[in-house]
Structures are given as C-alpha cells and as structure tokens.
Amino acid sequence: MDLARQLKNAISSGNLLFGQRQTMSACNSSDARMVIIAANCPTDYIEDLRSRHPDVPMHQVALVNRELGAACGKPFPVSAIAIVDGG
C-alpha cells in the first residue's frame, strides 16, 4: 500500500493534526504517536522536534510539502503531520 492511500485511510478513520505548530503542540502534550515530515521541511524545525521529543517516532518522506498536502487531500501544503490516533 502506498503512502497516499495509507494517509487517506488514517485521515478517514483516525485523528491527524496538520502543520508545524499543531505537530509541535501534539508532541509537547505527549499526544503524538508518530510524526510524518515532508522532504523540504525546515531543518531547524526537524532538529528542534527531534531534540525535544526523542521518544516520538519520526519519518521523513520523499514528498515535498505540496505533494504531502495533496496526498492528504488538502488544498494546501503540509510540512508536518502528527498522528494522534491511526484509526
């Protein structure tokens, strides 16, 4: 199963948060089970997120933020996704 299909399944059946601020907030409150990061997400954000939350699994995908947003069915770019409940 490809990433786009998995994301659409998670969106329809689970709880995902989109964007850098919401992802950081979910990690700060220990709600995030996993984080998906776009290929062109700023390096300083990724390093900050990894240093503050080393216990949260993070996966950087090959898709840039516009492609990641489209894969999620969103009309806007998405650079970070926090999976709170995968469904």
Name what the model sees in each region.
Residues 1-2, 87:
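Absolute protein N-terminus
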Residues 2, 44, 63-66:
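Charged, alpha-helix-enriched surfaces in structured cytosolic catalytic cores
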Residues 20-21, 39-40, 81-86:
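Fold-independent oxyanion-binding glycine-rich loops
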Residues 6, 31-33, 50, 73, ...:
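Surface-exposed beta-strand edges and their flanking turn/coil or helix-capping segments
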Residues 2-34:
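N-terminal first-folded block
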Residues 55-87:
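C-terminal structural segments of small proteins and small subunits
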Residues 22-59:
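N-terminal positively charged helical leader segments and presequences
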